[in-house]
Structures are given as structure tokens and as C-alpha cells.
């Protein structure tokens, strides 16, 4: 294979890898194997609840025995963040709380 072909193949393969999220992400490997709802689906559910919001952070955690995604969402022009908990098993919104800093 020529050098040019190798470089072109590497560029195509590199382009196929997903980009890293633009937010802080704490997702322990020990918990990821237990989820039934994908991170992408849970993110879409949380963002529908906070229109115009931007994800600042995600934490996959067990809280009170429930496995959940905890999303910190910032809305431009609004102080603080909105925290949305989405069940990692059902996709149901468990709670929404605005935390004004």
C-alpha cells in the first residue's frame, strides 16, 4: 500500500470514531454495564425537559438504590443550572431541580 493510501485510510478510519462529549462526564465502567437506556437517549430525554439548554456535566450514579443519569443543564441567560435525573433503566424522568448559584 502506498504512503498516500495509508494516510487516506487512516484519515477515513479516524473520522469514523465518535467525538468526545463537550461536557464533563463521570460514567463508571462498573455501572455502565447495568444500564438499559443509552447515554444518548437519556441526554435527549433530559434536553427535551430543559429546552434551549446545553449539557455541562453528566454523572451515572446510584442514588437511593436507583441507577440514574444526573444531567447538569445550563440555559443561556438564566443563572444556575437545572439538574435532571433520568432513570438509566426506564428512561423516565425522576426529578428536575433548578439550582440557582
PLM feature segments, named:
Residues 2-101:
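Long, terminal "pre-/pro-" and other extracytoplasmic accessory regions
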Amino acid at each position: 500500500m502506498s504512503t498516500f493510501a495509508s494516510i487516506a485510510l487512516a484519515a477515513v478510519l479516524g473520522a469514523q470514531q465518535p467525538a468526545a462529549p463537550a461536557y464533563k462526564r463521570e460514567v463508571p465502567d462498573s455501572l455502565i454495564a447495568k444500564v438499559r437506556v443509552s447515554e444518548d437517549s437519556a441526554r435527549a430525554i433530559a434536553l427535551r425537559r430543559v429546552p434551549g439548554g446545553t449539557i455541562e456535566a453528566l454523572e451515572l450514579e446510584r442514588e437511593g438504590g436507583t441507577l440514574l443519569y444526573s444531567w447538569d443543564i445550563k440555559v443561556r441567560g438564566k443563572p444556575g443550572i437545572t439538574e435532571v435525573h433520568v432513570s438509566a433503566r426506564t428512561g423516565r424522568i425522576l426529578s428536575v431541580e433548578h439550582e440557582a448559584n
